[in-house]
Amino acid sequence: MVIKAQSPAGFAEEYIIESIWNNRFPPGTILPAERELSELIGVTRTTLREVLQRLARDGWLTIQHGKPTKVNNFWETSGLNILETLARLDHESVPQLIDNLLSVRTNISTIFIRTALRQHPDKAQEVLATAHEVADHADAFADLDYNIFRGLAFASGNPIYGLILNGMKGLYTRIGRHYFANSEARSLALGFYHKLSSLCEQGAHDQVYETVRRYGHDSGEIWHRMQKNLPGDLAIQGR
């Protein structure tokens, strides 16, 4: 186990998470007692207690008053906030993880973008107008793309869509910095934003679904061509 962490708490957190991932602490089992675990990891019990509380909030553990701490099946108990951690734990599965993430984005955005354009066209146009002055480089486009999807999610009037996008932010923007290094990807995105703006102006809400699906397909093809050069820094850095 190779752990890169910048603090005792970060080290303890990564140690426990990787131990769960590698079945040293299998889901459904009981975590070692606090004293034993703190000595095993090499941190104070106070530090360990703080880490356990954080991991419980993220769904890795269940802390029960007066009872041993239980290791959860994180697939069933955690949220989108662990996406970057999963990417770090299993780099070989990152392409599939990203495919799943982008598929979810396309599927839900067909709903909230159409709703935003239909019910709140002024807000939608305000969001889409931010694409007019974007700098032509990967970092700027990664931030723009995330903010446009997130902005349209909130413009739909249903904040739950926005919260879902919030949960995707870390891994989403890391993917974007790699993807938008491709000039074809940047050009495709600008065309997509312009198309949405035109549909909004025309009130052609019935065309949004196919437009979003087409963009998901075309951007996915570019992404798949780029996957063989996937960088190793998509995962979250140690604390």
Curated annotation (Swiss-Prot):
Residues 6-74 form the HTH gntR-type domain. It is found in: Cytoplasm. The keyword Iron-sulfur does not apply. GO terms for cellular component: cytoplasm. Keywords: Activator, Cytoplasm, DNA-binding, Fatty acid metabolism, Lipid metabolism, Repressor, Transcription, Transcription regulation. SUPFAM superfamilies: GntR ligand-binding domain-like, Winged helix' DNA-binding domain. One of its GO terms (biological process) is fatty acid metabolic process. The keyword ATP-binding does not apply. GO terms for molecular function: DNA binding; DNA-binding transcription factor activity; fatty-acyl-CoA binding. Its main location: cytoplasm. Residues 34-53 bind DNA. InterPro entries: FA-response_TF_FadR, FadR_C, TF_FadR/GntR_C, Tscrpt_reg_HTH_GntR, WH-like_DNA-bd_sf, WH_DNA-bd_sf. NCBIfam families: fadR_gamma, PRK04984.1. Homodimer. Multifunctional regulator of fatty acid metabolism. PANTHER family: FATTY ACID METABOLISM REGULATOR PROTEIN, TRANSCRIPTIONAL REGULATOR, GNTR FAMILY. This is Fatty acid metabolism regulator protein. It comes from Salmonella paratyphi C (strain RKS4594). The lineage of its organism: Bacteria, Pseudomonadati, Pseudomonadota, Gammaproteobacteria, Enterobacterales.
